[in-house]
Structures are given as C-alpha cells and as structure tokens.
Regions:
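Structural recognition of the beta-strand scaffold that forms the well-ordered cores
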Residues: 40-43, 64-68, 110-112, 133-134, ...
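Alpha-helix capping and helix-loop boundary segments enriched in small/acidic/polar residues
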Residues: 69, 88, 112-116, 139-143, ...
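A contiguous active-site-proximal alpha/beta segment in oxidoreductase catalytic domains
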Residues: 131-133, 139-212
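N-terminal glycine-/serine-/threonine-rich beta1-alpha1-beta2 phosphate-ribose binding loop
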Residues: 1-134, 143-158
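Contiguous beta-strand/loop segments that form the cofactor/metal-binding neighborhood of enzyme cores
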Residues: 173, 185, 190-192, 196-238, ...
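Extracellular/periplasmic catalytic domains that process cell-envelope and extracellular macromolecules
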Residues: 33-35, 102-103, 127, 152-154, ...
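Short, solvent-exposed turn/loop segments enriched in Gly/Ser/Thr/Pro and often Arg
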Residues: 71-74, 94, 114-118, 138-140, ...
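Hydrophobic residues in alpha-helical segments
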Residues: 57, 101, 152, 178, ...
Length: 437
C-alpha cells in the first residue's frame, strides 16, 4: 500500500516578479568540476520542491544559496528549515524568481512550482546557463514540452525531470524482466491509480488575497481569476488552468513505466471516458474517475484512476500490470511480482514471488544521478528532458481525449481535429508570452 510519503504533492508557490519581461540576456553556460561545490537555488518552496531540495542537501557537494517563493510565510519558514539542515543561513531569499535565475553564483535551479509555471522558469534557467531539476509533469501543454526540449538542447543544459521512479532499483529490476521476453507477447498494459485518501474539495467563496502573497504572480501566465483557496496550494492540480488532474500527477509517474516497458513514446489513437462521479458537486474541474485507452500497433495501454476509492487491481491501489501470453508482471512502489498465465490448469511460466522495494529511496538516487550527470556533462539523465516530455505529452493526450469526448488519432504533431488541436498549446495571459525557441 502507498504511504503518506507518496502523496507529498502540495502545491508549490512561485517566485513573484518585478520586471514584466520573463527572460534574460543569455548567460555563458557554466560548468561544474568533479570536485566543485554545486550551488543550488529553489523556486517554489511549499511542497515537493522542498523535498527535492532536501534530497540535494543529502549530498556533501551541494550548497543551497537561494530560495524563492511568493508567500512570505512559506519563504521564511523554509529558510529556517534549510538553515537547521545545513547549519548555514541561506544567502539569498527572493520573491522574484527571475532574480534567482539571474544570480550568477547559482549552478542548478530546482523548479518546484505548479505545472503552469514550469515552461517559463525552466526555459529561462537554461537560457541563463543553469542546469535544471524540474518537477513533473514537465509542461502543462504539448507545445510547452516541445519548447522545453528545444531549450535544453539549444543551451546544452543537463535537465532531470522529477520522475524519480526512473532511479528506483526495484522498478529497474521489473523493467529488466519485462524486457527479457519471459512474459511472452504483451497484449496490454494496465495502469491504475486509486487514491482513497484524497477527499472531496468543498466549494468555497472567493476572498481577498491573504497578506504576504503575491497572487498575481502566482497566476502568472494563467487566466486572471479572484483568489480562491481551492485553486491554491495542493489543490491547484484539480483545475485545468494550472494542471491536468490525477492524469498528469500520478499518471506521469505510472504511465511513464508503460512507455519504458514497451519501448514506445506515442500511441496511434486515444479515447477516454469518465467524469466527476465520486464527488459530483465539489469544486474540482478535473475528473475524479477516468479510463483511457491508448492504442498502438499491436497492444494497448489502459489508464484507470479513481479518487475516493482505494482498491484498484491486483490487490493494490496503484501500479502497472504487463499482461503477457505467459504471465503478468505487476509492479508498484512496494515491489513487483509475476503471476503465471494458466492453460487447462497448467502454468505457462514460473511465478515470481513479491520482490520488495529496496535501497535508499528513488528520490535520493534520482538526485544523485542528476549530480553525476552535471559533473560529467552527460545530458542523458535517468529522467532526461526527452523522457519527461514524452510522458507529459502522453498524459496530455489522454486528457484531451476526455475533454473532447472523441476517439482521436495522433501523428506526433496534430490530431487533425480542430477541437482537439486547440488544446495543444495554452494561451498565456499578458504580459507573459510562450517562449520562442
């Protein structure tokens, strides 16, 4: 079963801005020697961003020299926590994320903000000569992901996306078994996330912006709306302006392994069905129940999520089942096993009993992998920018099929459907502009 640790998905707040131009004069790309200190700055300190920073600080070569958040209370409390961890006062505290990126002493920027900010901040960091650890999902639209890949390539930056399961050894062991061919031909991959812990979000009235929060900069490129606590902090992910619901949250982690296991990046067609069936009257916009079928040449990937229900498939509340002719490999964050297929009572292969998760934890290993790649200037991280883009776009395809209610075909660039194609790119609120790379 998934522990509360797995659900650290609180909304991460943003750096506030003074200048209205989001980009910078190109910086000379920096390099970090094998024995050099690696100086990091974090944008978005509330939730997963701070967990990422803590993982960085477990490595002796890392020094945190800057924090940025639009919420004074969050910024000051995280600065105190960081000082307690390191024994040193954080040198620079910002409410303007662009000032952090413009700090020439910073080698690595951690982007821990809500999804709708990832593209602007990651591209600006690359342009300024920083390497980047960007939380998942990589982008909030398909076009944003394409732009981010081009930026990392253009500025030759080492980017790791926060899909830390890519560095978790038991997941890698499971994929090695899938790739061994012992399961036989795989006909479908069942991917599921049932989150019974997640409650209904009651409708709340709009209210004045709390003191110490720059809400206009929290919105950034998203549409202008009155302040509402339901659209802020952790629950931002249930609103289309800022994120894509459980599909782009847990879906990015789990569907990523469907792509990895099957050695694919994009489907031929997608269809989806679902809705707000568990909590029909709550404040959320994204579906609390969704089934999506991605069709490839000779197999399917099926996504199934439900909020407020904890019993999924194979006795688990999340995971994947690679369904082969000889057996099914089931994997989740607790471990993996193989269930044989039986014909006339005879097993087609030997069962593999549960192989439990092991090691120091995927997030710690993921950050170590990033640091090693930074030192060696190897852009092929465990969750490289390309890997992050593939799965972020894959998840977006499912959401677009749901929102249009259509079976869609996909050629890698377009649906060739006017209604569906309008979802390929987000419209940015002025004065923010989609980066041109």
């Amino acid at each position: 079963m998934t522990t509360r640790r797995d659900f650290i998905r609180q909304a991460t707040l943003l750096g506030a801005g003074l200048s209205m131009s989001p980009f910078f004069i190109n910086a000379t790309p920096g390099s970090v020697g094998a024995n050099d200190k690696i100086r990091v700055g974090l944008i978005g300190c509330k939730g997963m961003g701070f967990s990422d920073l803590q993982a960085f600080l477990r490595n002796p070569e890392v020094e945190c020299i800057a924090l940025c958040d639009i919420d004074d209370e969050v910024l000051n409390s995280r600065a105190a926590e960081t000082q307690k961890i390191t024994g040193k006062k954080v040198k620079n505290l910002y409410k303007d994320w662009r000032k952090l990126i413009d700090n020439k002493d910073i080698d690595v920027v951690i982007v821990g903000t809500p999804d709708h900010w990832h593209c602007l901040q990651m591209v600006a960091a690359c342009e300024a000569g920083k390497d980047v650890y960007c939380e998942k999902p990589l982008g909030n639209s398909i076009e944003e992901c394409n732009i981010m890949v081009r930026a990392a390539e253009k500025y030759n930056r080492v980017v790791q996306v926060g899909q830390w399961q890519r560095s978790d050894p038991h997941w890698q062991d499971a994929m090695a078994f899938v790739h061994s061919g012992q399961l036989g031909k795989i006909r479908t991959v069942r991917v599921f996330s049932y989150q019974g812990w997640c409650p209904s979000i009651p409708v709340k009235p709009d209210e004045p912006v709390p003191a110490g929060i720059d809400y206009d900069m929290w919105l950034g490129p998203a549409p202008k709306r009155p302040f509402n606590r339901n659209r802020f902090h952790f629950t931002f992910r249930w609103f289309w302006d800022y994120a894509g619901g459980l599909m782009t949250d847990w879906g990015v982690h789990l569907l990523d392994y469907a792509l990895y296991g099957m050695n694919v990046t994009a489907p031929n067609s997608i269809m989806a069905s679902g809705g707000k069936f568990g909590y029909p009257d709550d404040a959320c916009e994204t579906p609390d129940l969704l089934q999506t079928i991605y069709t490839f040449d000779d197999f399917t990937v099926m996504w199934d999520h439900a909020i407020g229900i904890d019993d999924g498939a194979y006795g688990r509340n999340h995971g994947l089942g690679f369904v082969g002719e000889n057996g099914t490999l089931v994997v989740d964050r607790s471990g993996w096993e193989v269930i044989p297929e039986k014909v006339s009572g005879k097993a087609r292969m030997e069962a593999v009993p549960l192989k439990k998760a092991y090691g120091e934890g995927g997030l710690n290993l993921h950050v170590k992998n990033h640091l090693e790649c930074i030192k060696s200037r190897n852009r092929n991280c465990n969750a490289s920018i390309e890997i992050g883009a593939h799965i972020a776009k894959f998840s977006q395809l499912g959401n677009i099929a749901y929102r249009t209610g259509k079976k869609l075909t996909w050629d890698g660039k377009s649906f060739h459907d006017t209604e569906a194609d309008k979802y390929l790119c987000k419209e940015y609120r002025a004065p923010w502009e989609l980066p041109k790379i």
